[in-house]
Amino acid sequence: MGKTQILWGIAPIGWRNDDIPEIGAGNTLQHLLSDIVVAGFQGTEVGGFFPEPAILNKELELRNLRIAGKWFSSYIIRDGIEEAAKEFAAHCQYLKDVHADVAVVSEQTYSVQGLDKNVFKEKPYFTDEEWQRLFEGLNHLGEIAGRYGLKLVYHHHLGTGVQTEEEVDRLMAGTDPALVHLLYDTGHAYISDGNYMNILEKHIDRIRHVHFKDARLKIMEKCKREGNSFQQAFLQGMFTVPGDGCIDFREVYQTLLKHGYSGWIVVEAEQDPDVANPLEYALIARKYIDRHLLNVPATN
């Protein structure tokens, strides 16, 4: 991958949540971006409440911040490639206009992440024919992303058809490495499979974007016992920032360095901002990164 250059970002989801818009509704764009500067991060991802590019770019330039990417919910299996491609092209135009690097894609056909269903036991599964449609569709979206100077990075996610290590393996095997890359998310890997290193080590050559999401073990176990939905689980505090949960990010970070990873590492943790003050938790993450990751020599 060439010389390692890592950019550190933090996602807006700690301030406001796209799935539950009333959460953190009082946190303005200016408030969010200024908090990110105070916490010492270099950028963020686009939230659902972010404005048109001209307005956003002005706010970013005032604070010397950058945009890493933005989530795109694809429905390739449900709606077909042509419909998904049309929506994705508009998505990529926005990302190009805000000078982003990646387009984050997650196939949402049959997803339960926004439903009142047990996210631990009621995830969807694709048929062989649906997998093939997904492969073809993602390759096509990857071509579109490239035309806009972007990389398509696929987000494995709880409650979707591409969640488990086995499903990530299948996605990587079935798609073109030049067109479809991987967003590696520590929290989703850990909660899904109880292991966050396997996906990283197996697919390091496909990883072009990283989310550092931590998990609170006791709350996760409680949510599993209660059969919580995805939204119920994060509102109870299942997710948190690095340094406040049970994931050892030192091993993850050293592996990324060893393989010459270049790109964004974005801290991301769905939490209720009325319970977990966004700036406070951004600073917890920043302190952990500075003390336990950046001040440790790289291992061979």
UniProtKB/Swiss-Prot annotation:
Pfam family membership, one: AP_endonuc_2
GO biological process: inositol catabolic process
Cofactor: glutathione; Co(2+); Mn(2+)
Listed SUPFAM superfamilies: Xylose isomerase-like (SSF51658)
Listed InterPro entries: IolE (IPR023952), IolE/MocC (IPR030823), IolE/XylAMocC-like (IPR050312), Xyl_isomerase-like_sf (IPR036237), Xyl_isomerase-like_TIM-brl (IPR013022)
TM segment ranges: none
EC top class named in words: lyase
The reaction(s) this protein catalyses: scyllo-inosose = 3D-3,5/4-trihydroxycyclohexane-1,2-dione + H2O
EC number: 4.2.1.44
Top-rank taxon, per record: Bacteria
Keyword Ion transport in record: no
Pathway entry: Polyol metabolism; myo-inositol degradation into acetyl-CoA; acetyl-CoA from myo-inositol: step 2/7
GO MF annotations in UniProt: manganese ion binding; myo-inosose-2 dehydratase activity
Keyword annotations of the record: Cobalt, Lyase, Manganese
HAMAP family linked to this entry: IolE (MF_01672)
Family, per entry: Belongs to the IolE/MocC family.
NCBIfam families the record matches: myo_inos_iolE
Name of the featured protein: Inosose dehydratase
Organism annotation: Bacillus licheniformis (strain ATCC 14580 / DSM 13 / JCM 2505 / CCUG 7422 / NBRC 12200 / NCIMB 9375 / NCTC 10341 / NRRL NRS-1264 / Gibson 46)
